[in-house]
Every structure is written in structure tokens, then in C-alpha cells.
From Swiss-Prot:
Record's comment describing the protein's domains: The CysB motif binds 1 4Fe-4S cluster and is required for the formation of polymerase complexes.
Binding site for Zn(2+): 1012, 1015, 1027, 1030
EC number, as in UniProt: 2.7.7.7
UniProtKB keywords: 4Fe-4S, DNA replication, DNA-binding, DNA-directed DNA polymerase, Exonuclease, Hydrolase, Iron, Iron-sulfur, Metal-binding, Nuclease, Nucleotidyltransferase, Nucleus, Transferase, Zinc, Zinc-finger
Motif (CysB motif): 1059-1077
Pfam families: DNA_pol_B, DNA_pol_B_exo1, POL3_N, zf-C4pol
GO molecular function terms noted in the UniProt entry: 3'-5'-DNA exonuclease activity; 4 iron, 4 sulfur cluster binding; DNA binding; DNA-directed DNA polymerase activity; nucleotide binding; zinc ion binding
SUPFAM superfamilies per the UniProt record, alphabetical: DNA/RNA polymerases, Ribonuclease H-like
Biased composition (Acidic residues): 31-60
UniProt cross-references to InterPro entries, sorted A to Z: DNA-dir_DNA_pol_B, DNA-dir_DNA_pol_B_CS, DNA-dir_DNA_pol_B_exonuc, DNA-dir_DNA_pol_B_multi_dom, DNA/RNA_pol_sf, DNA_pol_B_thumb, DNA_pol_palm_dom_sf, DNA_pol_type-B
Official protein name in the record: DNA polymerase delta catalytic subunit
């Protein structure tokens, strides 16, 4: 059941009252860090909680575990199923003889009450322990607890402060920390501040030719104390002073980095890397706290990070989906509506097929080929058994579609309502319940989205909906539309309003629901494989060094910050902690050389700068550590620094190479290596890994510039970002000047070259030659020559030729794309409506067809005639509703004015809050006819509502506001007067609505009066079909009506059969309401047309 709607959480029943967890057991998954330590990306914001969250101290975990039977109640081939579910047993693990090697997938930390004997660190608790969850090559699950790592941060060392002052500072800071605490148990901790040390470092901000200077390192006992201690220094909290120093505020360094990420950076471990624990450096946990097969304790000092070139481990992936039985007209709510089915698909990473496909059902269900049906009599049993199934299968990664915002929260809230406390123990830590909190994520690329964050230690939740929203721009993100787009297949969508009827029906009815539910678990797994999503994200985690779970829940900044911290640590640089304000000076973006619009029937060569922004940063050594102020620059010889076109100053690389340029060099060098290996690799799986790696490296390199320019980022630097774009503008102008001055008739060439357009990193050159081969030759020569005028590694590359080329405006063009002189690769379109998401399908299809006729067929007359026929069909309501649906993202809750999709969302919320669009969703709508002068936002309507209520669309709006502008843009460079396309015989017949008793009029014209079927004459009471003057044509009219009914019946039968095939049965009625499927609207339209056609045919009073 895939819905983008998220309903409220659980009840307020404080059923579980708690005892503390058993001694030496671990109690949580890093949820004790203070809030702002989790705000790793500045575009995150925490919202209200989902339902009610219980702390672990509110749950009697001890009693739950004691009463939690893991006996699984399944029928028929139960022993075989249990064997399939279980992992392979561990073989020959002898800690003092053999190393333990595993791939870590999830990293977090917990607090332990007492230290583990033999492990480093303080000898009195509480203490933090890093937890690495992973899988061995044999497929065994691992929990490795790393001891001895403590949180720390730095402050600048005041003058006169020495090693002798460290002890008194530690004492005073401990006292201040205890005074500021409102927790009694914190006051009992002897040393919140574990140590004060002086280290030689330097700040990354600004060029500093001097040697390293003193900084104070403050080490604390637990991560949750970092924020409070930082505030003491930054804000002068409690007027704290360093002994012997006047009262002042201090700049802190590296005080807002997540504790688990700090560990990975300090140990040189990347996300999803392989870990080795050498023999005799680890021991099996005496009191296991997890459900992992292997649980060990080890020291911080002995853990080893291995090369990340090895193949991924065979980790287990669970894809699941749930179905709920809602009440009539109400979207399911966990407080009231039962979970009736849960489907599951399980496979090992790297395998082609799943080894588990089953479905847990409430009540009986007919058998399903290829799936194991596990029925239950009570909902409580279904939920308990499914949770046991999850624990038994022990998945490393849980996937699905919208599971984070719907399925998992619904299951947890429903179990709470049914008083099943053990259900929330879904993670791998036996005493840690899964908690849910609401978050709000914002970024310039992705907009604002509300989401949930679910703690499930040891299991990575990977919501395919979130991944696809991040990586692909689609008109709709429903599972139906995504599957149609990527897998080229539609799926049946059973509306939630009829699910209860199916559930209350027969075993066969529930089987139909089960087939639908299973498909919603199968499709995410297929999308995962098709798009190589997990492979690509795993490689991104390795490249950037962050845990896999950070990549979906956080923005781009965390990835760059991780790389910057790693490089800074090696160089003894410190990264300052700044308050995020979201304010700052804006700067001019990239230049666009003004286009010369036209239809070019000669080849246009395109020259592209390779990795433009990274290349500029490397060429000019742009970095935090090389930045000079104007005053500092005046004191230095001008030959050792660069002055950017914007007037900023940076030290040149031969004096001091910056960290950012070195990071970029390593990323691009590694990408080149991955691409070279990809060319020679034959194994499909290894090819996918290498391709994912080179893509991750490319994205990471391109993200560095954006990181410096993010005004709400962790380390914004306007001087870097504006310098990059100013160099880019200068380079485009220089390229234009060189090409137009060199390739001229005066210099011996056949034509004068002209730059007809330039945008950010590309220039389009008209050399005047007649063939693609000639344009390619001159393009290569020009790229090579211009490159010699720039500083390395800036490189201008010839990439392609457009021929023919239709240039309409800035960022709006189309052409045939050639990389070989003999045949074009494809039709390439930029900025036009066929690639935009805020236009209806009609516009995209029409623009695409017209461009094919102009560019490929080179038949302008055919393009004109086709356009006129579409306009005629539109004005006469002969088009499917699916062609006229528009979608826009709901990115804000409040807009300055009345915005069409926001107003529709309000209207839908008033009708049914449960099914209304949420923040971040794309809102589909159609424009209906309204009163004269009505604003457009009043005429927006939900397509399904319009369909069900037979509301006539405003076809004139679609012509004037959707079709006309893009068509004028296309035809203007080709025709002398493109407006003529919108006038003429084909525009004279326009469908009008005359309301009948039942308010019909959605797809056709309805008449008030009974008139002759051949002429406009009104009929008498004795006439039913034709007037007396047209009676001789009655037979012909009858034949036409009969043929129309027959044709519509055939169309309806074909649509009905197609829908039946999609549902998996040719013997059951069609229930699908997939609004992303054009067949759904076509079937309904044909059905309505057929009703009207039969009414017309019945006027002939023919006896059958």
C-alpha cells in the first residue's frame, strides 16, 4: 500500500512503565546527543514527533524480553521455511587464532554503564562505545563494539596559558558543567571533562605562513556534553573564565561533528568499508546485547580499515509492504484501522533472485504461485509473527517504497495501540526500541520535505521513494509512475476505500489483495537493481567517508565536510564551528553568452570545459587555507598570490597548496582510475560497482563548489564561490574572443566562426562548414588551441555537434546530437516543455513530436498539420484527461500569494485531510471551467475528483497558457508568422457545457433541446431522430451511430482487458484506480462516451 500521506501516530496510553535495563547491557543507539549535534546539514530542521515517543526508560524492557517467545507459528512446510529464513551458522571463529573481517554497513554509538575489562579508556562509567554493524564474506552478521574513543573539541589557546594551567582548567570546567546540568545523575559523574591538553594546530580559515600554534583540546566523557561545553566557551555561559585569563568568548573548533563520524575520520575508516580485527585483539562479548551472530569487543587501537576495492559482502535485503483496512471514505489510521497483510521479499546482495517471497495475512487466503502464504486469525498474531520473522531473517538493509513515512510508523503505532510492546524491538539491540521523530529537510536542489526518522540500530532503512526523489526529476513519485518510467510497466492500484471489502470477502478476494501487496514489495527490489541504487550509494559512502544511512537523511554538505575533516586532520588544520544564520551576501552566478536564436541547418560544434568548477578551484588554488585579506595581500609580493576577477586574493599553489584543490585532485584522479578499470572489466557486478564509484567521485567533486557557496552551510566562504563563478565568466568571454578572432576568412578559413550561444561551461560555435565531420575536426582543433591559453588543469574539450540545431532562448534549445560523423546519437533537448515537469503530458508529447518532425524528418508542413489537429482535438474535448494533468511540488506551507497547487491542496485537505498532499509531494491538478474572470487558482481541481464528477475542463486555458508559448518558441525561428497556427478552421468548433440534470459534460457537448441529428432544426414531439427534411438520411445516421457504439465497445473491451492483465487475472473485475496510468483515465472516458453513444443509438427505436 503506497501512499505519500502520513497519518498521526500512536495513542497516549502510558502502558509501559519501566525498570532500568540490566547491568552492563547497552541501552541505546546514540539518541542522547543534544539536538544541534544532529543538525549536521544546515538544511535540516526537526519538526514535531510522530505520535508519542516513549523513552526506553518508559518501557519494562526486561519483562518484555523475558516474555518474548521467538517461536514462530507457521503452517505446512514450517521447518523448511525456518531453514530458509535463518542465516548460515558461524564457522570456526577463534578470536586468539583468527582475525575477524567484515564489511561495516551501519555505525552509531551507545553509552555503557561500566567499562569492559581489558579495554582502554576511563575505568569508571558511563562511557561511550562505538558500534559497527556489518556482515562477513560468509554472510554472518556482526556487531563490533569499539572501546576507548572519547569526544573532543578545540578552542584557541589564550596568551600565557601553559601545560601547568590544564589541571585547574579541567577542575573549573568540570564544576561549571555540573552547575549547568539539571540532571541529578550527571552531577554524580566525577569527571565530565576527562582531560585538557595543548596541541600544535592551525585554523583552516585564511593563509597562515607561520608554524603551528597552541590550541586547547578538551576531551569529554560523553558526546552529549559537547554542545553544552561548547556553549560555555562561545557564549560566555555562567561567565566562565580560563584560570589566569580575563572573561571573554572563545572560537571553538570541530565542536559540531557527529561522534560516530568523528570516529570514522580519526581511524581513517570510510562508509561501508571492510574492517579487520587481527587475531588476539578482540574477544566475544560475555553478555551479548544484540541479535547478531557474532558480537565482539575490541580496542580503538587495534581496529584496521582495509582497502575498499573488495566486492560487497552478501548482506541481506528485505523489501516489504503493508496493507491496512480503512473505513469508508477515511484513509487508514493506526489508532483504528487494522494491518491486514504484510508482504516480504528477501535476497542477498549480489544474487539475481530472492530466496524468500511470502505474505503474512489476516484471515485465510488462496494460494499464490511462487509465494508462501502465512495466514493468521488475529491481527495481534500477525504483527507478532512478522516481527519474529524480521528478527529471524535478520536483514541488514530494509527497503520499500515510502516505508519511512508510512509503513514502519504505521506498524509501530498500530502495535502500540494493540498493546504489543515487544513489536518496537525491531533493531538488532535487544533492549532498544525503535523510536520515530518528525524531521524537515530543505535544500536548494530538493526543496522542502517533511519526513520521519526511525531509530532501528543495526538495520539500515533505505526508502526507495526518498532515493528516487533525490536522484531523479519526475512528474510524480508514486510507485506506479516510477515503475512505469523505469521498468516500463504499469501496476494495479487498489484504492484504499475498497481494501476493506476485499478483506471481508472470500479467500480469493484476499488473494487478489495479496498479489497487489506482494507486487508493491517486488517493485522496490526491482528498482533497486535496475537503478543500481544501493551499489551507487555504497560507493558514495566509500568515496565521501560517511555512513550509508547519512546519504538519504542528510544533505550534500556532510559529504564534503567529511572529506575536508579527513584532509585537515592529516595537515594539522582545525575547522572552526560557526553559527548557521542562513544570511549572507548573494553573488552573481555563471555567465550566459547571449544566444542568437534561429534554426541552424548547418553543424554547430559544442566545446565543453571539463569539470569546470573543480578545475578552476585547482588551477587557481582556491581554498579556505589560501585565502588572503586585502590587508594581508598588500604586505606580500604580488607574484605569490592570485587576484580573482572579483577582487579576492589567494596564495598560489607553488607557495602553499590548498586542501580543497588536493581533495579535488584525488577525487578526479580516482575517477579516472575507476573509468579506466571499467573499460577493461567484464564481470557485470564489478562493472556496476566501478560505474557507481566513478559516478560518486564525479558528484563529490562537483559538490565542493556548492559547499563553499551554501549560505546556510557549515563552512560557507563567499570569497571562494564568487571567485569560481567570476573566473568562469572570464573564461567564457576569453573563449569567445579567441575562437572568433582565430577562425576567420582573413586567417585562411572558409568562413568566419561565430559563437551563437554560451552557458556556464559550454560554447556553441558555428564554423560555417557543411558537414558534421568538418565541424568535428574544427571543434577538436579549437578546443586544443584554446586549452593552451588556460592554466592547467583547465581543459576545453570538444564533445559533440548539433545538426540541425534549433536555438530559441537562454537554456532553451534542441538539436540532433552527434558524436560520430556517420549517424546521430539522439535528439537532445534542454529547457523545453518536453523535459519540464510543470507542464501537462499533452505539451510534452506535442513538443516532442513536433521536434522529431522538424529535426529528424525535416518536414515543417507535417509539423504544422499535426499541431493544428492537436489544437482541434483539444478544443473539442477529444483528449484523454491523463494528457492534461499538471503537477507541481508543494515546497512550502505558506506562499506570499494564492498559488494554484497550494490552494488545491487546501481544498483537498478540507475534503479529506488523510489523502491531501503533504509538504514535499508533487500535487497533480487539472484546470476546469469556471465563472468568467475567475482566478486560475479557483479553477484547479484534483484530476480524480474531476473525473468522478464529470467536470468539464477549460480547454481554452490549455491552449493559451500551456500549448501556445512553447509552440510559438519552436515555430518562431522557422515561420514568419507562427500565430497563424492558432487561427483558422481547426479552431472554430469549441466544446461548450450545457448542464443537464446529472451535471454531465466532462467529455463532450450536452444539448438542452432535442434537435435533428443531421441539422440544427428542433424536433417535434413525434420526431425522435431527424426532422422531416432529413428523414432520407436516417439510415445513414443510424449506421454511423451503430459503428460508433461498436467502436467504443471495442475500445472499452481492450482497455478493460489490458487492466485485467495488469492486475494478474482475466476473470475478475477491474478495481484499479492508478491515477498515474493513462489507461485508467482512458477506460473511464470511453465508458462515459459509450453511455452517451448508446443514448444516441436508442433514439432510433430499433427493435433488437
Amino acid at each position: 500500500m503506497k501512499r505519500s500521506i502520513v497519518t498521526g501516530g500512536g495513542n497516549n496510553d502510558k502502558k509501559f512503565k519501566a525498570q532500568p535495563p540490566p547491568k552492563n547491557n547497552y541501552r541505546g543507539g546514540g539518541d542522547d546527543e543534544e539536538d544541534d549535534e544532529f543538525e549536521e546539514d544546515d538544511d535540516e530542521d526537526e519538526g514535531d514527533e510522530f505520535g508519542e515517543e516513549e523513552d526506553e526508560d518508559d518501557i519494562d524492557v526486561e519483562n518484555i524480553i523475558a516474555s518474548d517467545s521467538m517461536d514462530i507459528d507457521i503452517q505446512d512446510d514450517g521447518s523448511q521455511q525456518l531453514f530458509l529464513w535463518s542465516r548460515k551458522p558461524v564457522q570456526d571463529l577463534v578470536p586468539h587464532k583468527k582475525p575477524l573481517i567484515f564489511q561495516q554497513l551501519e555505525v552509531d554509538y551507545t553509552e555503557i554503564k561500566e567499562p569492559v575489562p581489558g579495554m582502554p579508556g576511563p575505568k569508571v562509567g558511563p562511557l561511550p562505545a562505538i558500534r559497527l554493524f556489518g556482515v562477513t564474506k560468509e554472510g554472518n552478521s556482526v556487531l563490533c563494539k569499539v572501546h576507548g574513543f572519547l569526544p573532543y573539541f578545540f578552542i584557541s589557546c589564550p596568551p600565557g596559558f601553559t601545560e601547568a594551567d590544564c589541571k585547574s582548567l579541567k577542575h573549573d570546567l568540570n564544576e561549571s558543567m555540573k552547575m549547568s546540568s539539571n540532571q541529578s545523575n550527571e552531577k554524580d559523574i566525577e569527571n565530565i571533562v576527562v582531560s585538557i591538553d595543548i596541541e600544535k594546530k592551525k585554523s583552516i580559515m585564511g593563509y597562515n605562513p607561520n608554524p603551528l600554534s597552541d590550541f586547547i583540546r578538551i576531551t569529554l566523557i560523553l558526546p552529549k556534553f559537547v554542545t553544552r561545553c561548547r556553549e560555555i566557551f562561545e557564549s560566555g555561559r555562567h561567565h566562565f573564565t580560563i584560570p589566569g585569563q580575563p572573561f571573554r568568548q572563545y572560537q571553538t573548533y570541530e565542536s559540531n561533528i557527529l561522534f560516530a563520524l568523528r570516529f570514522l575520520i580519526d581511524k581513517g575508516i570510510t562508509g561501508c568499508s571492510w574492517i579487520e580485527l587481527p587475531a588476539n585483539t578482540y574477544k566475544l562479548s560475555e553478555t551479548p546485547v544484540s541479535t547478531c551472530q557474532i558480537e565482539v569487543d575490541t580496542s580503538l587501537e587495534t581496529i584496521i580499515s582495509l582497502s575498499d576495492d573488495d566486492s560487497p559482502a552478501p548482506y541481506r535485503i528485505l523489501s516489504f509492504d503493508i496493507e491496512c483496512a480503512g473505513r469508508k471514505g477515511v484513509f487508514p489510521e493506526p489508532e483504528k484501522d487494522p494491518v491486514i497483510q504484510i508482504s516480504n521479499i528477501v535476497k542477498n546482495n549480489g544474487d539475481a533472485e530472492p530466496f524468500i517471497k511470502n505474505i503474512f495475512t489476516l484471515k485465510g487466503c488462496s494460494s499464490i504461485v511462487g509465494a508462501h502464504v502465512i495466514p493468521h486469525k488475529r491481527e495481534e498474531d500477525l504483527l507478532r509473527e512478522w516481527r519474529k520473522f524480521v528478527i529471524k531473517v535478520d536483514p541488514d538493509v530494509i527497503i520499500g517504497y515510502n516505508i519511512v513515512n508510512f509503513d514502519i510508523p504505521y506498524l509501530i503505532s498500530r502495535a502500540r495501540q494493540l498493546k504489543i510492546p515487544e513489536f518496537a524491538l525491531l533493531g538488532r539491540i535487544k533492549t532498544t526500541i525503535s523510536k520515530i521523530k518528525s524531521t524537515r529537510f530543505s535544500s536548494s536542489n530538493l526543496g522542502t520535505r517533511e519526513s520521519k526518522e526511525i531509530s532501528m540500530p543495526g538495520r539500515t532503512q533505505f526508502d526507495l521513494m526518498q532515493a528516487i526523489q533525490r536522484d531523479h526529476k519526475l512528474t510524480s513519485y508514486s510507485l506506479n509512475n516510477v515503475s512505469a518510467h523505469f521498468l516500463k510497466e504499469q501496476k494495479e492500484d487498489v484504492h484504499f476505500s475498497i481494501i476493506s471489502d476485499l478483506q471481508n470477502g472470500t479467500d480469493d478476494d484476499r488473494r487478489r489483495l495479496a498479489v497487489y501487496c506482494i507486487k508493491d514489495a517486488v517493485l522496490p527490489m526491482r528498482l533497486l537493481d535496475k537503478l543500481m541504487i544501493l551499489i551507487n550509494y555504497t560507493e558514495m559512502a566509500r568515496v565521501t567517508g560517511v555512513p550509508l544511512s547519512y546519504l538519504l537523511g542528510r544533505g550534500e554538505g556532510i559529504k564534503v565536510l567529511s572529506q575536508l575533516y579527513r584532509k585537515a586532520m592529516v595537515e594539522n588544520f582545525l575547522i572552526p564551528t560557526y553559527k548557521v544564520t542562513g544570511k549572507g551576501e548573494k553573488f552573481q552566478g555563471a555567465i550566459v553568452i547571449e544566444p542568437t536564436p534561429g534554426f541552424y541547418d548547418t553543424p554547430i560544434a559544442t566545446l565543453d570545459f571539463t569539470s569546470l568548477y573543480p578545475s578552476i578551484m585547482m588551477a587557481h588554488n582556491l581554498c579556505y587555507s589560501t585565502l588572503l585579506s586585502a590587508e594581508e595581500a598588500k604586505k606580500l609580493p604580488p607574484e605569490i598570490y592570485t587576484t580573482t576577477p572579483f577582487g579576492d586574493h589567494f596564495i598560489k599553489s607553488d607557495t602553499k597548496k590548498g586542501l580543497l584543490p588536493r581533495i579535488l585532485e584525488e577525487l578526479l584522479s580516482a575517477r579516472k582510475k575507476a573509468k579506466d578499470e571499467l573499460k577493461n572489466e567484464k564481470d557485470p557486478f564489478k562493472r556496476a560497482v566501478l560505474d557507481g564509484r566513478q559516478l560518486a567521485l564525479k558528484i563529490s567533486a562537483n559538490s565542493v563548489y556548492g559547499f563553499t557557496g551554501a549560505r546556510v552551510g557549515k563552512l560557507p566562504c563567499l570569497e571562494i564561490s564568487r571567485s569560481v563563478t567570476s573566473f568562469g565568466r572570464e573564461m567564457l568571454d576569453k573563449t569567445k574572443k579567441i575562437v572568433e578572432e582565430r577562425y576567420t576568412i582573413a586567417n585562411g578559413y572558409k568562413h568566419d566562426a561565430v559563437i551563437i550561444y554560451g552557458d556556464t561551461d559550454s560554447v556553441m560555435v558555428k564554423f560555417g562548414v557543411k558537414t558534421v565531420a568538418e565541424a568535428m575536426e574544427m571543434g577538436r582543433d579549437a578546443a586544443k588551441f584554446v586549452t593552451t591559453t588556460f592554466i592547467r588543469p583547465i581543459n576545453l574539450d570538444f564533445e559533440k555537434v548539433y545538426y540541425p540545431y534549433l536555438l530559441m532562448a537562454k537554456k532553451k534549445y534542441a538539436g540532433l546530437y552527434w558524436t560520430k560523423p556517420d549517424i546521430h546519437d539522439r535528439m537532445d533537448v534542454k529547457g523545453l516543455e518536453m523535459v519540464r515537469r510543470d507542464t501537462c503530458l499533452l505539451v510534452r508529447n506535442v513538443v516532442s513530436t513536433i521536434l522529431k518532425k522538424i529535426l529528424i524528418e525535416k518536414d515543417l508542413k507535417s509539423a504544422e498539420e499535426y499541431t493544428k489537429s492537436v489544437i482541434s482535438d483539444l478544443l473539442q474535448n477529444r483528449l484523454d484527461l491523463s494528457m492534461l494533468v499538471i503537477t507541481k511540488a508543494l515546497s512550502k506551507t505558506q506562499y506570499k500569494g494564492k498559488v494554484i497547487h497550494n490552494e488545491l491542496a487546501r481544498k483537498m485537505r478540507a475534503r479529506d485531510p488523510a489523502t491531501a498532499p503533504n509538504l514535499g509531494d508533487r500535487v497533480p491538478y487539472v484546470v476546469i471551467q469556471g465563472s468568467k474572470g475567475a482566478p486560475i487558482y479557483e479553477k484547479a481541481e484534483d484530476p480524480l475528483y474531476a473525473l468522478e464528477h464529470n467536470i468539464l475542463l477549460d480547454c481554452q486555458y490549455y491552449l493559451d497558457k500551456q500549448l501556445k508559448a512553447p509552440l510559438i518558441r519552436i515555430f518562431k525561428p522557422i515561420m514568419s508568422n507562427p500565430d497563424l497556427i492558432f487561427h483558422g478552421e481547426h479552431t472554430r468548433t469549441i466544446a461548450q457545457s450545457t448542464l443537464s440534470d446529472n451535471n454531465k459534460g466532462f467529455f463532450g457537448t450536452l444539448k438542452k433541446k432535442k434537435v435533428c441529428m443531421n441539422c440544427p432544426k428542433e424536433l417535434t414531439d413525434t420526431e425522435s431522430t431527424t426532422c422531416i427534411n432529413c428523414q432520407h438520411k436516417e439510415a445513414s445516421l443510424y449506421q454511423t451511430s451503430l459503428e460508433k457504439v461498436t467502436s467504443l465497445e471495442t475500445k472499452f473491451s481492450e482497455a478493460w482487458t489490458q487492466c485485467q492483465r495488469c492486475s494478474g487475472s482475466l476473470h475478475q473485475p477491474v478495481l484499479c484506480s492508478n491515477r498515474d496510468c493513462p489507461i485508467f483515465y482512458m477506460r473511464t472516458k470511453v465508458q462515459l462516451d459509450l453511455i452517451e453513444a448508446k443514448k444516441t443509438l436508442n433514439r432510433f427505436n430499433v427493435e433488437w
